[in-house]
Amino acid sequence: MKVLGIETSCDETGVAIFDTAAGLLGHCVHTQIALHAAYGGVVPELASRDHIRRLPLLVKQTLDAAGCELSQLDAIAYTAGPGLAGALLVGASFAESLGLALAVPVLPIHHLEGHLLSPLLAADPPAFPFVALLVSGGHTQLMRVTGVGEYALLGESVDDAAGEAFDKTAKLLGLGYPGGPQLAALAERGQTGRFRLPRPMLRSGDLDFSFSGLKTAVLNVVSAPTWRAEDVADLAADFQAAVVEVLCAKALRALEQTGLARLVVAGGVGANRHLRERLDASTRRKGCRVYYPEPELCTDNGAMIAFAGALRAAAGQRGGETPAVRVFPRWPLAELHSPVQP
């Protein structure tokens, strides 16, 4: 079964083809970083217009890379949410139109399910059940995963997501867009221990997160009369260390509370080198194992959507009887259901 995946939830246009017999045949991603850099963040209208321009060409490029014809597609999967409403509608309308023309099923896919399942694309994938740590610009969640569509929320951020905290703190430090990766790169040049920053909710006893107070602590540092601009790399390093410590502590607590020994880390922040090293060392000491997607699949991409669509189609999920453009800008992952069995 060959499934075309389309991702347009925010500022990346991603297209991929996954074959249940041969694996990932090809995928292409266009990032809009240059488009939004002048504004210091994503402009939804510009994002939607760029998806419209890029999507047809990316589909052709992906088909060429996969050595595949449109007529060989068995299903189409698209990101239906959560995300920017206009951006989601671009992908949804394209997918439904193409599905109607080809007379193939069209499957709406949850964006976070795509991230969560992306480590299963690796050569040595984790088996169910496992704990998943989803860390991105919009979400920080811990889930107990027992199968495709079987997700139980263990904890989540009560305010800013980890990636959002990285981006907002980068702005406070005067870094460019996208701020999170630039802050992480700056932290590589800094020394930890110079600034005493809080670890919010580290000892709360539950599995929830909070990062807004950490961001405020950084603001207080840079607003103080004693602040020196030459210390910015050290402050970035201490900020990153605080976020990583909280993420690791909560992930380990989730493993202990569930009795599971497998941890999956997904989302853009999951590519952070410091986070990976800390999680690798911590889980090894506990006799557990951590799994990650390939670095290129940590950020938004069509491969994870095609893969999730293929898993759901193989389990019996079908598209609607009639074409319907369905998007859900707000869509809790815990509300997602298992694929309908045939």
From Swiss-Prot:
GO terms assigned for molecular function: iron ion binding; N(6)-L-threonylcarbamoyladenine synthase activity
Note on cofactor: Binds 1 Fe(2+) ion per subunit.
Location in or out of the cell: Cytoplasm
Keyword set includes Acyltransferase: yes
EC number(s) on file: 2.3.1.234
Source organism superkingdom: Bacteria
Matching Pfam families: TsaD
Enzyme's top EC category: transferase
Major location (coarse): cytoplasm
Keywords: Acyltransferase, Cytoplasm, Iron, Metal-binding, Transferase, tRNA processing
GO cellular component, one term: cytoplasm
Binding site for substrate: L134, V135, S136, G137, G138, D167, G180, N272
GO biological process: tRNA threonylcarbamoyladenosine modification
Names of the cofactor(s): Fe(2+)
Reactions that this protein is recorded to catalyse: L-threonylcarbamoyladenylate + adenosine(37) in tRNA = N(6)-L-threonylcarbamoyladenosine(37) in tRNA + AMP + H(+)
Family to which this protein belongs: Belongs to the KAE1 / TsaD family.
Stated name of the protein: tRNA N6-adenosine threonylcarbamoyltransferase
